[in-house]
């Protein structure tokens, strides 16, 4: 019974950590990252479709992303979707592909991204604390139902806290790593 609670807590905590890392991919660092376009969708025959499912998206160099649609009529649609996404660059349509030229980041932009990374980390920590609360509630219910003794419950609470501390530390390390990556010129 307790192992199920611990395993569930571990699984959910891992998911929170993975979600944080996925969120980090949306932050721009010194070099371009094609994942900055992951949230952009285009109208493809009446259906909103992710950009990477209708075009080839490549980072041609450290400051340029090239988007080549599989169907030429999509060029205008892709161009307007990127403009509407407000990612800080203007799309450049050359008739074959859409190119995005990212200017070097200013110190202020880097610091703003660090703030966003810290906020994402804080959100992940809140998620971990909510997972801890759910695990503690499950232990409390077992104790109340007399399925486990008071001593077993105390050990279980300690184990839940230990798992929480482990994942909180992992989140802090991820944020610190991302922060140094963002500030690197």
UniProtKB/Swiss-Prot annotation:
Compartments in which it is found: Cytoplasm
UniProt entry tagged with the keyword Disulfide bond: no
GO BP of this protein: cytoplasmic translational termination
Keyword entries, A-Z: Cytoplasm, Protein biosynthesis
GO molecular function, one term: ribosomal large subunit binding
Disulfide bonds: none
A GO cellular-component term linked to this record: cytosol
Pfam families for the chain: RRF
UniProt key word Hydrolase: no
Function according to Swiss-Prot or TrEMBL: Responsible for the release of ribosomes from messenger RNA at the termination of protein biosynthesis. May increase the efficiency of translation by recycling ribosomes from one round of translation to another.
Family per record: Belongs to the RRF family.
NCBIfam families: frr
Protein name: Ribosome-recycling factor
């Amino acid at each position: 019974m307790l192992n199920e609670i611990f395993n569930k807590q571990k699984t959910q905590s891992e998911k929170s950590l993975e979600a944080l890392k996925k969120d980090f991919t949306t932050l721009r660092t010194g070099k371009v990252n094609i994942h900055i376009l992951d949230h952009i969708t285009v109208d493809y025959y009446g259906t909103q479709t992710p950009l990477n499912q209708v075009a080839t998206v490549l980072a041609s160099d450290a400051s340029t992303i090239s988007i080549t649609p599989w169907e030429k009529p999509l060029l205008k649609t892709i161009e307007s979707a990127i403009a509407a996404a407000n990612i800080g660059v203007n799309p450049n349509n050359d008739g074959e592909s859409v190119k995005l030229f990212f200017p070097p980041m200013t110190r202020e932009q880097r610091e703003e991204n660090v703030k966003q990374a810290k906020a994402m980390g804080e959100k992940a920590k809140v998620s971990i604390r909510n997972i801890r609360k759910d695990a503690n509630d499950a232990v409390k219910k077992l104790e109340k139902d007399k399925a486990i003794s008071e001593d077993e419950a105390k050990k279980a609470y300690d184990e839940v806290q230990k798992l929480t501390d482990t994942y909180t530390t992992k989140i802090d390390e991820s944020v610190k790593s991302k922060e140094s990556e963002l500030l690197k010129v």
